[in-house]
């Protein structure tokens, strides 16, 4: 976990600075989505992005590690997308003719429990990091439709100039049956 990066890479100060930088990036991303600044959000995604959210199943005790989540490339998932498909989703929403987003939802992203699991080549000179976080996304539609999405994300971020780009995001939604009428939220 975060201690492993600190010990392996030689210093709490470097880890703390890296973690703060990553948190700032994730919080900025959440703000862009909440403010519907989708074009700027898309700029945070790498061209080779993999954006994946498996479907979860209820399984017998002891089988959850192997069978609870669908596997990418096998079966179905809520999302198995790249930057191009996310760009098309954004374009569709911005037409104003998207039935599930007209009028636009009010969204609030909360990101917490950020942990830098790995930094390559080191915390001091990180070019790529693996980050785990928790999220809560509140969605309000029309007058009285409200939905909560809760779960965890594992992101791989790549250094790009003075910031980061998301190259992989795996989203684990902590529900096996979608409670919302549609899934137009970006996580």
Regions found by a protein language model. Name each.
Residues 110, 126-127, 138-140, 153:
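Charged, gly/pro-rich active-site loop segments
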Residues 184-187:
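Short hydrophobic/aromatic patches at helix-to-coil boundaries
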Residues 24, 107-109, 149-150:
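Short solvent-exposed loop/turn micro-motifs enriched in small/polar/acidic residues
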Residues 2, 124-132, 149-182:
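Short beta-strand edge/turn micro-motifs at domain boundaries
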Residues 45, 135-137, 170:
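Short beta-strand segments enriched in hydrophobic/aromatic residues
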């Amino acid at each position: 976990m975060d201690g492993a990066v600190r010990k392996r890479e030689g210093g709490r100060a470097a880890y703390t600075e890296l973690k703060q930088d990553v948190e700032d990036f994730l919080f900025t991303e959440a703000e862009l989505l909440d403010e519907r600044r989708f074009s700027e959000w898309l700029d945070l995604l790498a061209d080779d992005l993999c954006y994946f959210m498996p479907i979860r199943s209820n399984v017998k005790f002891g089988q959850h590690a192997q069978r609870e989540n669908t596997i990418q490339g096998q079966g179905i998932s809520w999302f198995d997308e790249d930057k191009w498909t996310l760009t098309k989703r954004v374009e569709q929403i911005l037409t104003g003719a998207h039935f599930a987003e007209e009028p636009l939802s009010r969204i609030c992203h909360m990101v917490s429990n950020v942990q830098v699991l790995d930094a390559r080549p080191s915390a001091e000179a990180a070019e790529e990091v693996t980050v785990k976080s928790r999220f809560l996304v509140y969605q309000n539609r029309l007058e009285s439709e409200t939905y909560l999405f809760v779960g965890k994300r594992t992101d791989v971020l790549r250094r790009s100039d003075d910031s980061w780009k998301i190259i992989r995001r795996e989203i684990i939604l902590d529900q096996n049956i979608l409670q919302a009428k549609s899934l137009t939220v970006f996580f």
